[in-house]
């Protein structure tokens, strides 16, 4: 009889161990061959953007001489106002982000005079760093199968905490994105108001293109990151300023580009492409008057990314 009891006890123990092993197996095997691991990892918050800030510069020609290089048919004083309206319309179409900057200056006979900067460098305010809650701690894997049931309960608890944590983090991040969008919109409104309030006076003395480029180069040097510059001009330099600014790795767009003589326009374009490349510009695009639109300027400034 004792032998029968021992046999029944052995069978019962075997069944219990088999049941325990089966219970563990149903949760998977993420924690190794012993017991299952968590089935839901908390989403890792996106790292702060590492994209460089962008500084956008706009140089607008307000000079008009009426000489052989710039004939009376040149559309000035329409050019400054057209340029101002174009820039104001393009700003909300750019991918502006906190940390990006904008400035604008006149091209005149004395372009490198600081008084020609009618829109001082302004930066989109940076947002404060997100204070995210700590992620829940992953349960410690069990040492053996005897701890499997307890571990399985810890896994279930962890998964619930991770789900809640992920939702909380997602909500905080969305609020931050919404706040940044409002900050950018407010910034754009202010810059647009300043652009539309600008009143360019016609300068009959001459045109100093290189002086304007020197202003832009100085601003770019003080603001690390990507640099994008738009000049609204026919690029007829009549002053011959000896300054040679550093436009290293800047993207340059020449807009509202027009000369009465098509041949002169083509020759000048090639000369300026070479000159700007010598100054370090990475790329130069020429947009004739008819092709200079709000959308085209925005597209060119977004070209090549941040």
Task: Give residue ranges: language-model regions.
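Bacterial signal peptide processing site
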Residues: 25-28
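VWA/integrin I-like adhesion module and closely mimicked acidic/polar interface patches used
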Residues: 235-275
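Von Willebrand factor
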Residues: 51-224, 228-230
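C-terminal motif of bacterial Sec signal peptides marking the signal peptidase cleavage site
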Residues: 20-23
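Extracytoplasmic/secreted cell-surface and envelope-processing proteins
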Residues: 66-73, 112-116, 237-243, 262-267, ...
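C-terminal helix of von Willebrand factor
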Residues: 266-306
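Bacterial N-terminal signal peptides that target proteins for export
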Residues: 1-13
């Amino acid at each position: 009889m004792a032998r029968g009891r021992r046999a029944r006890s052995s069978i019962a123990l075997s069944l219990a161990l088999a049941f325990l092993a089966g219970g563990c197996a149903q949760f998977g095997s993420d924690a190794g061959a012993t017991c299952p691991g968590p089935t839901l990892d908390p989403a890792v918050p996106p790292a702060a953007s590492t994209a460089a800030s962008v500084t956008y510069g706009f140089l607008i020609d307000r000079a008009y001489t009426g000489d052989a290089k710039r004939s009376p048919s040149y559309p000035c004083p329409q050019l400054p106002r057209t340029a101002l309206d174009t820039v104001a319309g393009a700003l909300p179409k750019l991918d502006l982000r906190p940390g990006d900057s904008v400035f604008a200056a006149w091209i005149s006979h004395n372009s490198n005079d600081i008084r020609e900067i009618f829109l001082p460098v302004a930066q989109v305010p940076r947002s404060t760093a997100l204070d995210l809650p700590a992620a829940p701690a992953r349960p410690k894997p069990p040492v053996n199968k005897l701890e499997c049931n307890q571990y399985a309960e810890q896994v279930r608890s962890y998964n619930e905490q991770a789900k809640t944590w992920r939702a909380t983090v997602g909500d905080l991040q969305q609020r931050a994105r919404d706040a940044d969008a409002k900050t950018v919109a407010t910034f754009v409104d202010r810059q647009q108001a300043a652009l539309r309030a600008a009143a360019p006076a016609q300068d009959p003395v001459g045109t100093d293109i290189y002086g304007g480029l020197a202003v832009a180069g100085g601003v770019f040097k003080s603001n690390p990151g990507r640099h994008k510059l738009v000049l609204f001009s026919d690029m007829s330099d009549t002053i011959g300023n000896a300054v040679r600014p550093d436009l290293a790795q800047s993207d340059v767009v020449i807009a509202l580009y027009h000369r009465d003589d098509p041949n002169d326009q083509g020759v000048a374009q090639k000369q300026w492409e070479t000159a700007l490349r010598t100054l370090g510009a990475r790329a130069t695009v020429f947009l004739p008057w008819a092709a200079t639109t709000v959308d085209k300027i925005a597209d060119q400034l977004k070209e090549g990314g941040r």
